[in-house]
């Protein structure tokens, strides 16, 4: 089997901006400020929490922080028609914030959603985090990604490397750099 050539698209689509990626601790003030900023400019927010057993508690916290927001919850243990209705409702703008598991990782295109919070980011692989971050920044608005982690010095070294790589390589077309980091591990 021969090696194949690799093609890299190095030019971003017109009017697209890099996703501003930040590593943050679990902090309600950061959540409130980031969500309010996005909602004030007419956008929507993803909040990823990959634990179904307490996802509704997280949704309750977000609803308490932003009482006027229309909050929805989506996860893979929901009945198919209920999940589909929730996701379509978010895509159509019926909800401001979607609290979800990684079910949104692939195939969900919501150009109006330009902020994503990823809770316990240290528990995900590099490609998962890159895919989730890619759910935002699909329009001509600046997008924001918040990787929520414990203090970095409390994380395993491989988790630290993953999170720092995502923060460092956030420009459009950065996927190839992340692949090279992933291969070298």
PLM features: residue spans?
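Long, hydrophobic alpha-helical segments
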Residues: 165-170
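Short, intrinsically disordered, charge-balanced linker/junction segments flanking boundaries
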Residues: 171-177
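Conserved small/polar residues in nucleotide/adenosyl-binding loops
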Residues: 181-185
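Inter-lobe coupling/hinge segments of SF2-like helicase ATPases
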Residues: 1-164, 177
